[in-house]
């Protein structure tokens, strides 16, 4: 049958709010509509465009139920790993907007495992979001700079500066250098805000290594006076 509302993530976020200090802000994270589409199996809709739209509507419904949150990260590794075809590229911005429009929070579309191809990047730029996220650990980060130079970017950016798949903990100085490198490469672009994070989801990191990386990112953010 059709995709239907679950509320599971909203429930997890409600529980998370109980752990926050009074002045702490909640950040929510979801798969982006294209990556969820790419990883899901369609046994009902029978049409890629309809299935893609249904997934975006489903995610939008989930977001609408979220408790108050300051930032929503939509994770879109599949935009790099399995880039959309031309038809889905043209539907990409609308799908992202379907999700992002259901929150008043700042929405970040974070991509990783490398750089986006030019057409996908250009279409993603049409989405009404606060920031796009870039993998600065990947070897093809020069291609990311090329996209930004050619098509521009948002007024804020999310930078994946720590390796989310390697237990080696980078120093705050190394992470700060990666931020400085990025800013130096595009001097004409001034950002209202930078979000700093691991480049990928740190699923496979031991908890202690994950915490050490977060501490290093926070220290780098303190140097940059940006948001981690």
Regions found by a protein language model. Name each.
Residues 1-228:
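Domain-level signal for soluble alpha/beta catalytic cores
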């Amino acid at each position: 049958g059709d995709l239907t509302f679950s509320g599971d993530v909203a429930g997890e976020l409600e529980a998370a709010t109980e752990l926050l200090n009074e002045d702490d802000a909640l950040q929510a994270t979801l798969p982006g509509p294209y990556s969820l589409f790419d990883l899901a199996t369609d046994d009902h809709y029978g049409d890629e465009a309809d299935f893609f739209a249904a997934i975006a509507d489903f995610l939008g419904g989930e977001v609408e139920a979220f408790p108050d949150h300051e930032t929503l990260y939509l994770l879109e590794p599949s935009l790099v790993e399995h880039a959309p075809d031309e038809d889905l590229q043209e539907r990409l911005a609308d799908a992202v907007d379907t999700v992002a429009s259901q929150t008043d929070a700042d929405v970040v579309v974070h991509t990783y495992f490398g750089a986006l191809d030019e057409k996908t990047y250009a279409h993603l730029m049409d989405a009404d979001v606060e920031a796009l996220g870039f993998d600065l650990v990947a070897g093809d980060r020069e291609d990311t700079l090329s996209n930004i130079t050619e098509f521009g970017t948002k007024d804020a950016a999310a930078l994946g500066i720590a390796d989310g798949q390697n237990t080696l903990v980078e120093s705050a100085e190394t992470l700060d250098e990666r931020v400085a490198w990025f800013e130096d490469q595009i001097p004409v672009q001034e950002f209202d805000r930078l979000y700093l994070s691991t480049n990928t989801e740190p699923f496979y990191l031991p908890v202690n290594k994950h915490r050490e990386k977060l501490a290093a990112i926070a220290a780098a953010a303190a140097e940059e006076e940006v948001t981690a």
